[in-house]
Amino acid sequence: EHYVDTSKVTIDLKFDLQSGQGLESVVGELLVTGGSNPGLIELSLSKNIASRFFGFWVKHIFWNVHCGRLNNTGRLNGHPHKDSGESTLLSIDKIWTLPALPLELAERYASEILRLSCGLEKEPYAFLAKSTFALLFEKETQVKSAFKGINIGSSVIQGERDDSYWQRYCMFSGDTGSPINSDELPVLNDTIFYKQVLDFVEQIEVAELEIPVPVSKSKRETEAQRGRSEQ
């Protein structure tokens, strides 16, 4: 319904990270729902959205900074802004609704992410998205499966321990301290993204989408013949 009517919004945000390097800018376009109370929206065509979720979470944060600052400016001018801080992530079988964030908190989260981004050239940062997603929203066994992989008959679905970036990170970790064993599940709950999402994990709504079951051609023909015989 209202998800069909969408438009793009340009954001241009400035942040003072107090790092001695001046202001940091975040500029980009976000897809939002139409109507009188637009909110951020994104579509994922995969059932497994773990690898997309945290990227969407980052967009959600900057969208809330955008909305919060516009709302503050609008109130000062006597014209409150109506953009919604809620965000919707659509997959092929679920609707994920992320709650609006208070402006002060959204700005703090945004600053944390920008500091992390600015420091990546000097200090690598390991983040296992699928394993962390499983820790937040799924069972412990699924955390292990996301990291170690799964054997299904003769097929193997690789886990994040086989990821080339993780392997490289572990390989060079010995240069700055104790080497990391790439086959051991690392501590996941001390990352920025885990801590941020954990604060709101109980407020994130997940609704199942009803997927119509396709009717085979032979079944349609049988039903048509039955209908003709009843007439």
Name every feature range the model reports, one short phrase each.
Residues 1-231:
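Structural signature of nuclease core domains in nucleic-acid processing machines
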